[in-house]
Curated annotation (Swiss-Prot):
Protein name, as recorded: ATP synthase subunit beta
Record's catalysed reaction(s): ATP + H2O + 4 H(+)(in) = ADP + phosphate + 5 H(+)(out)
Intracellular or extracellular location(s): Cell inner membrane
Alphabetically ordered keywords of this record: ATP synthesis, ATP-binding, Cell inner membrane, Cell membrane, CF(1), Hydrogen ion transport, Ion transport, Membrane, Nucleotide-binding, Translocase, Transport
Organism for this UniProt entry: Acidobacterium capsulatum (strain ATCC 51196 / DSM 11244 / BCRC 80197 / JCM 7670 / NBRC 15755 / NCIMB 13165 / 161)
């Protein structure tokens, strides 16, 4: 079949208009390649575009997946005959790829046997799996208060600088290194430095082996802050396509980490404006819910294999009612909300146990004891929150004996919900802790039952199990 070739007629930043013969206009989401053959340019142009709009009379408006520096009118645009296709399969493990599936790790080409388009249908309703099984993360506050669902979708919500990426990196460290299946990390519009750190940490942890990729268990797909909006909008789909292949063809339990889903929405807003759409609430794109739904509906577990996804969600100006985080909420099985007031108290991870939720925190899934302890912890923390105004105005001495005891236990619980992380060890100097769920439930049960009312609250800070707390209390006693 003869090549379908068009001509670039307008370049305005990442938006490019291309003229084709009307009979051979490429379809929406088709990929085009612009080349600088015959043009005298300092660096050769070889840029992938994605068709977004048909303007009529053979003209299509496209969004570039790479910078359009040096592109001029008159350049050739070759229709690639289908959507952007990326390499998938075991050959992607250990590699760092960009939105169009090209390696960016200077380790040579990806020798993949299979390529798949990034635009695909979500699995049919009757193919989806509906099991309910808890997924242990080793992070106390998560396992106790908002347990993660195996094969579910989890959101980490937080404003700027409260620790979303650190929590995601700890989950990767705890889960990817102990987990038997494959992991895919999609870096969507986040810092390049964090992407580099993660790649190096994966090598140290043995999750990636750059000397023998066949021993690696993770693939990294990056579209960082420096990329044009087209790349940031589509890189989540590229990562998801790699994860879908492991789920459907390998039947593997796959982990998909996305940092940050808000940048996906932000890039969509930029693209929407470039395409001339009328903005909707707070300046977001009018198709925000549709775009989010198309991505989220594909992140699911089927009868062949599971995809458990953990998504960081930036909350602009700490406003949970902002359309971007509010639209994401609807798709999740568990939400972990990171709180600025807690991070200011030095409690890390700064998870707000009262604002975080999980669909599987029920006796039927986690067991009666776990459920009762989690509700007991929430009850004590809620009562403490209710009493804070009285304490601020009148002082703690004006409380009843019972309320003073509740406040004392709540402060211990709050401190005990902190935990040293492996990935933060180099900053804190405290070795990381992985806490088994049985130890976590037992430890908190003892605290809320009042077995450790005599232990000073400072002993509970940054500890793993109750045994470590008692050991610290003995040291404090001996030092007096």
């Amino acid at each position: 079949m003869a090549e379908n070739i068009g001509t670039v007629i307008q370049v305005s930043g990442p938006a490019v208009d291309v003229q084709f013969p009307e009979a051979t206009m490429p379809g929406i989401y088709q990929a085009l390649r612009v080349v600088s053959d015959g043009f005298d340019v300092p660096t050769p142009i070889n840029v992938i575009l994605e068709v977004q709009q048909h303007l009529g009379e053979g003209r299509v408006r496209c969004v570039a997946m790479e910078a359009t520096d040096g592109m001029v009118r008159g350049m050739k645009a070759i229709d690639l005959g289908g959507p952007i296709s990326v390499p998938v399969g075991r050959e992607t493990l250990g590699r760092v790829l960009n939105v169009i599936g090209e390696p960016v790790d200077n380790m040579g080409p990806v020798q993949a046997k299979v390529h798949m388009p990034i635009h695909r249908q979500a699995p049919a309703f009757d193919e989806q799996a509906t099991g309910e099984e808890m997924f242990e993360t080793g992070v106390k506050v998560i396992d106790l208060i908002q347990p993660f669902l195996k094969g579910g979708k989890i959101g980490l919500f937080g404003g700027a600088g409260v620790g979303k990426t650190v929590v995601i990196q700890e989950l990767i460290n705890n889960v990817a290194s102990k987990h038997g299946g494959f992991s895919v990390f999609a870096g969507v519009g986040e810092r390049t430095r964090e992407g580099n750190d993660l790649w190096l940490e994966f090598q140290e942890a043995g999750v990636i082996d750059i000397h023998d990729f066949s021993k690696s268990k993770a693939a990294l797909i990056y579209g960082q802050m420096t990329e044009p909006p087209g790349a940031r909008l589509r890189v989540a789909l590229t990562g998801l396509t790699v994860a879908e292949y492991f789920r459907d063809q390998e039947g593997a339990d796959t982990l998909l980490f996305i940092d940050n889903i808000f940048r996906f929405t932000q890039a969509g807003s930029e693209v929407s404006t470039l395409l001339g759409r009328m903005p909707s609430a707070v300046g977001y794109q009018p198709n925000l819910a549709t775009e989010m739904g198309e991505l989220q509906e594909r992140i699911t577990s089927t009868k062949k294999g599971s995809v458990t996804s953990v998504q960081a969600v930036y909350v602009p100006a700490d406003d949970m009612t902002d359309p971007a985080p509010a639209t994401t909420f609807a798709h999740l099985d568990a939400t972990t909300v990171l709180s600025r007031p807690l991070s200011e108290l030095g409690i890390y991870p700064a998870v707000d146990p009262l604002a975080s939720t999980s669909r599987i925190l029920t006796p039927a899934v986690v067991g009666q004891e776990h459920y009762d302890v989690a509700q007991g912890v929430k009850r004590i923390l809620q009562r403490y929150k209710d009493l804070q105004d009285i304490i601020a105005i009148l002082g703690i001495d004006e409380l009843s004996e019972e309320d003073r005891l509740t406040v004392s236990r709540a402060r211990k619980v709050q401190k005990f919900l902190s935990q040293p992380f492996h990935v933060a060890e180099q900053f804190t100097g405290i070795p990381g802790r992985y806490c088994k769920i049985a130890d976590t439930v037992r430890s908190f049960k003892e605290v809320i039952e009042g077995k450790h009312d005599s232990v000073p609250e400072q002993a509970f800070y940054m500890k793993g199990t109750i045994e470590e707390v008692l050991e610290e209390a003995e040291k404090m006693q001996a030092a007096k």
